[in-house]
A protein has these predicted regions:
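Beta-strand-rich ligand- or partner-binding modules
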Residues: 26-96, 405-407, 413-511
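Hydrophobic core segments of beta-strands in well-ordered, beta-rich domains
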Residues: 78-83, 103-126, 142-168, 190-195, ...
């Protein structure tokens, strides 16, 4: 539903320019559905209403509501603006993290100015011109160094913006290593955190001052976990063994702890697809929850289910690692799956984050037809409900992870390009509210125009649970009245594909 001009809207409503109040909680005035928007809008310019939201069709839009009236005089408290949860506000940046971090990056935010990344440690590789033999690099001579925020001895490395702490000087064990940063620019290497058999690290979480580092063993099978109380010592933590007994094949799991302390895992489920032909991803994801993150995971309903129709046939595929890496538990590399038609989209390598109760799942997206892979993401107001598709970004097999750091969100991939976002909120939204003080259906006084936006912050003790402060206009200084009107200006201020999509306006009144 598009609105071309103020006059067009006026003719559509052809009559009264005010509404009698409909009650909700404390008689709040809420606009959040297509019917609400159509009923409450007096005029709009450059705006489109679709699926219960309003957004600019071009660079700018202006929306004016009808006067919301009541028989009794009331005092307004605040106006809250809620945007779509689609979260398209991502911009490309060069790879974050250490330049020699290899394989799929795993991120862990411990708190403000305390950010960690895990990955394989890639050695220096000399450049070789075509037709010439590779020449060895000259030995690097480290020097003592100092870096703000680190009170330990440091040494320079041949890699830019990277330093070795004492733990980083210890010999690797064939698995993942740990790097720490205070600013997401300079990185301190603290050495190995997993071993050769545990090299398939998929996710990390922070629990009561300890790092839980999850890995598949063998590859694409049951998640196992280390509990590491000291990420600085260059020694892997305590290997707790298998954490999740995966009833399917697939793993590449992402873990997230909820605010009650329960650990959730989102896992690939290869039962409906030949994953070997779809980048080892699947249209189906599993979800399980545990009270401690170490064991006792109970499976729930799937958070992502994009299966097509089962044919009733069963077929097989082969995995290259299972019997080789864990011959005691896996006697064969052959697995069965249920054939589905038509062709299915595939997702995987899951990573999760929650912002003010809104959950997001990021992962691989392998579309139908063998087109370019990318990062795809889903969202849900509850981790126990099915997630809704949002969008995709980038090129190549991403194996992504997502984290909150330095007041913004980082999306890391194993491709040359990563992404950064200020959050799901998209600028710019300006609002003002007017009041009819004498019941003549005319506005007598307006607030000043004010920009509103959401704000995000850390929650102490949680890595992937982020607090959200609403986009709110304080109306406490507005005089009491019988009618209220909202004016809103929307400006697409970003250089990416996002734009401000307003899903809800809620004007609350004092009791």
């Amino acid at each position: 539903m598009k609105f071309a001009s103020c006059s067009a809207i006026a003719s559509c409503f052809a009559g009264a320019l005010f509404l009698t109040a409909t009650t909700s909680k404390a008689d709040d005035w809420t606009i959040e559905s297509n019917a609400d928007w159509s009923k409450n809008i007096k005029s709009a310019k450059g705006a489109e209403i679709s699926k219960g939201s309003v957004a600019p069709t071009g660079k700018t839009a202006t929306v004016v509501t009808r006067i919301h009236s009541s028989d009794r005089k009331r005092s307004a408290d605040s106006l809250v603006v809620t945007q779509s949860a689609i979260w398209q506000n991502w911009s490309p940046i060069q790879n974050i993290g250490p330049s020699n971090l290899g394989d799929a990056p795993v991120m862990l935010t411990v708190g403000p100015n305390n950010y960690w990344m895990f990955g394989r440690y890639k050695g220096r590789q000399p450049r070789r011109k075509k037709g010439q033999k590779q020449k060895p690099l000259p030995p690097f001579q480290p020097k003592s160094a100092k870096l703000d925020g680190f009170d330990m001895p440091l040494q320079t490395t041949p890699y830019p913006n990277q330093f070795n702490a004492p733990g980083g000087l210890k010999k690797g064990k064939g698995g993942y290593h740990a790097w720490q940063s205070r600013d997401m620019k300079n990185w301190v290497h603290h050495g190995p955190v997993t071993e050769g058999f545990s090299k398939w690290v998929t996710s990390a979480e922070w629990v009561d001052g300890k790092a839980y580092i999850y890995y598949d063993f063998p590859n694409d099978q049951d998640p196992h976990v280390y509990v590491d109380e000291n990420l600085f010592d260059g020694v892997p933590g305590k290997n707790m063994g298998i954490a999740v007994k995966d009833p399917s094949h697939g793993s590449d799991a992402g873990f997230i702890r909820d605010l009650k302390g329960n650990m959730h895992v989102i896992i690939e489920d290869w039962s409906p697809i030949n994953a070997s032909k779809r980048s080892w991803d699947s249209p189906l994801a599993g979800h399980a929850v545990s009270p401690n993150g170490l064991n006792g995971f109970v499976f729930k309903k799937p958070p992502v289910d994009k299966r097509t129709k089962p044919t009733g046939k069963t077929a097989t595929y082969k995995h290259p690692h299972w019997a080789k890496e864990d011959p005691k538990r896996f006697k064969t590399n052959i697995a069965e799956y249920k054939v589905h038609e038509p062709e299915q989209e595939a997702f995987g390598d899951w990573a999760a984050i929650c912002i003010g109760g809104q959950y997001y799942l990021f992962g691989d997206y392998d579309p139908i037809g063998g087109h370019q892979m990318s990062v795809g993401w889903f969202t849900s107001p509850s981790i126990d409900e099915e997630f809704t598709w949002c969008d995709r970004i980038g090129k190549g097999h991403p194996d992504p992870d997502v984290a909150f750091a330095q007041g913004q969100f980082y999306l890391a991939t194993q491709q040359p390009t990563d992404y950064v976002s200020p959050g799901p909120w998209v600028e710019t939204v300006e609002v003002r509210v007017g009041v009819d003080t004498d019941k003549d259906n005319l506005i007598d006084e307006w607030t000043e125009w004010s920009e509103v936006k959401e704000k995000y912050d850390y929650i102490k003790g949680f890595s992937k649970q982020i607090s959200r402060s609403p986009a709110k206009l304080d109306l406490s200084k507005l005089p009491a009245g019988f009618g209220f009107q909202i004016q809103m200006r929307l400006t697409d201020s970003t250089e990416n594909k996002s734009k401000p999509i307003v899903e809800k306006l809620s004007l609350s009144f004092k009791e």
